[in-house]
Amino acid sequence: MTEFTLNAQARTDLGKGASRRLRHSANIPAVVYGGNQDAQSLTILAKEITKLFENEAAFSHVLELNVDGAKQNVVVKALQRHPAKGFIMHADFVRVVAGQKLTAKVPVHFINEEAPVKKGGEISHVESEIEVSCEAKDLPEFIEVDLANAEIGTIIHLSDLKAPKGVEFVALAHGDDKAVANVHAPRVAPEAEGAAE
């Protein structure tokens, strides 16, 4: 696994006003919790966290969070982004404890997409990430979805995917066999249909 490090400082100035002041000073508020320890409020440099999460792999790797010199292993639980501009406004991290399962969202990588397209199909990506449950050592960088044998009308569900060893799909474990992608016939605009007649 690639190692990702993020520096942070503990903060005691809490609330909406404090968070707003942080953002105006090129920092963002964050919190780390779990691991049988109290939640801790943090301050992180906006440019540092933005650079880290430009790398897709950072979302599905154990990160080393350095809080005022004290290092701890964490995974990102959630990033709150500005609705219009997309920049990170807040981050939630969960501490990783060896031997304990964690849940994380892992990106989906679609391969062999050209195969159904050559057969005249169009692909709809229903899910771009999948929530998994596993120990930190088993956390995959991504889940691969192979579309080589997909035909028009194919719907690929979670149950069609092979989970890596030690990894469980959370939705499937709760009886929700979500669709991940489907292949359908091209949609024809009504004007085009009329012109063809």
From Swiss-Prot:
Record HAMAP family: Ribosomal_bL25 (MF_01336), Ribosomal_bL25_CTC (MF_01334)
Disulphide bridges: none
InterPro entries (alphabetical): Rbsml_bL25/Gln-tRNA_synth_N, Ribosomal_bL25/Gln-tRNA_synth, Ribosomal_bL25_b-dom, Ribosomal_bL25_C, Ribosomal_bL25_long, Ribosomal_bL25_short, Ribosomal_L25_dom, Ribosomal_uL5_bac-type
Alphabetically ordered keywords of this record: Ribonucleoprotein, Ribosomal protein, RNA-binding, rRNA-binding
UniProt keyword Thylakoid, yes or no: no
Extent of the signal sequence: none
GO molecular function, one term: structural constituent of ribosome
Keyword Transcription: no
Pfam families in the record: Ribosomal_L25p, Ribosomal_TL5_C
GO cellular component: cytosolic large ribosomal subunit
Protein name: Large ribosomal subunit protein bL25
GO biological process: translation
